[in-house]
Amino acid sequence: MEKVKVFLSDPQILFREGIHFILSGEEDFEVTGETTNNEEAFTLIQANPPSIAILSMHNAKADGLDVTHRIRRNLPSVYVILIMDKKDPEEIFLAIKSGASACFTKDTEPEHLLDIIRVVAQGSLPIMEELFTPALASLVITEFEDLAALNEEVGGLLANLAPKELQILNTIAANNNIEQVATKLDLSEDAIRRNIRLILNKLVSNDQARTVIEATQRSLPSFIRSGKRDLKNADYITRAEFNEFKDRLMERLKSLIV
């Protein structure tokens, strides 16, 4: 039986060693490395990719969300599970957008943690279940509303919610569980889950695309970023150079969304 290779990163050594101890007692797991900071974790994971990386969400030397972004962008075969201080809806939402497959708090029971790691190793997304809560559904709706203006600027390359997806989210946000959503919308629970999975994928791809957009905007001359046309105190670029820049941006966004 091929073992699930796990990398651990958490600044609290006793907690990290506790997870190591739990995993070492299971035949299907192998801890391939561990560290106290996420920046070093990323370097070690790149050198020897595990099946799963378990990272602290908040780390003084490297934010877990940023490292999750980088892992999922550069090493898509590596799944990430984030360790959270508490189950806060806004932090869970950030974890979802980063591309994490799951998250857990430090008071999670060992058996439940083992279950989470096993289902993530099979390619499942336990974090998706969080989108069935009213608070998270409301945050998702707001996120897509806020992205509308940016999406116009980049030619509609960001993913929008489909009408059915928005309907499902609105129904969840109105404090309905999945069974009630299925009844109210005359959909099967499987169909609802498929739509939620699509929404999750859109959140991740949009967040990656926004990172690219913000980075490219910072590289533009200031008069373009501000929308001003006073060239006296600004660097001059030709129309051809600007069109080339736009084309490169579009290609990078397409590669993230496809």
Where do the language-model regions lie?
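Conserved acidic segment of CheY-like receiver
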Residues: 2-15, 19-23, 53, 161
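Conserved phosphotransfer microenvironments
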Residues: 38, 54-68, 88
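Short amphipathic alpha-helix used as the core "switch/output" element in two-component signaling
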Residues: 65-77
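Short, flexible helix-to-coil linker/hinge segments that flank and couple to helix-turn-helix
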Residues: 93-96, 107-156, 220
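Regulatory hinge/linker segments at domain boundaries
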Residues: 138-170, 224-236
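Recognition helix of helix-turn-helix DNA-binding domains
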Residues: 174-210
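Basic, Lys/Arg-enriched C-terminal extension of HTH/homeodomain DNA-binding domains
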Residues: 200-258
